[in-house]
Amino acid sequence: MNSRVNKQVEVRELGLIGYQEAWDEQERLFTRIVDQKLSNRTLPHQAQQLTPNYLLFCQHPHVYTLGTSGHVDNLLVDQDRLVNELGATFFKIRRGGDITYHGPGQLVGYPILDLDNFFTDIHRYMRLLEESIILTLADYGLDAGRIDGLTGVWLGYNDDSPQQAGPRNVGPPRKICALGVKASRWVTMHGFALNVNTDLSYFNHIVPCGITDKTVTSLAAELKQPVSLEDVSNRVRQHLADLFDMELVEKTLEPHPQTGQ
């Protein structure tokens, strides 16, 4: 391993982008990092190059994705109806977790990181992703947390112990952020999906994350008003930078044809 590390992370805002296109971009950046790591193994120490890191933020048109450990039975409608009636697409992908929904109004984050630049611990990595969302929700006055044995971020997470409940941590357990990652050679891809202004009716057509006895929510649903996605994105990235000791570098991209911005 290269003993020098790179804490810089290039942030890219992709706007509203098709799932396949975003997946291709993840794969391209992932491969770039892995190829550099493999190349470094063949070079003397002084010639080795620092590996890059990326943080992608986007929204997707309506799409359902199924992870490697998921069950297609958790998709409750046939794929023809998905396309023809719901205007959605469906992908089987190589990440952990079961089935989830992505759509407009949801903040999706894809960290493409070389964990050799930070720490080589996948469990810690996932917990820090969750923590960045928990801290972001706290900025809006919401007391979010984790549920033992389940990934993601939840409200009502300790509903069985009302005496421990904090502000707005009331009601049944409901998921506000899904998490699913892949890592190879300590390089990560995929990430998290935070429901901000999401149309939650699209979750009615799946068993979200394969969990039958819990529901989903969004920031807008909890606060009873729409929330600036840009503001949420800025808060998430700052918490990620603090938790991972990152130096964020903004990358200006050409306007995406689906968004014009």
Task: For every predicted segment, state its role.
Residues 107, 184-198:
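Conserved phosphate/anionic-ligand binding catalytic regions in large, soluble enzymes, centered on
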Residues 173-179:
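Local beta-strand/beta-hairpin segments that build beta-sheet-rich folds
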Residues 1-170, 227, 257-261:
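N-terminal lobe of the biotin/lipoate ligase/transferase fold
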Residues 114-116, 182, 195-197, 222:
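Solvent-exposed residues in well-ordered beta-strands and their adjoining turns
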Residues 139, 180-181, 201, 209:
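Glycine/proline-rich loop-helix segments at beta-alpha junctions forming the active-site rim
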Residues 201-261:
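C-terminal accessory segment of soluble enzyme catalytic cores
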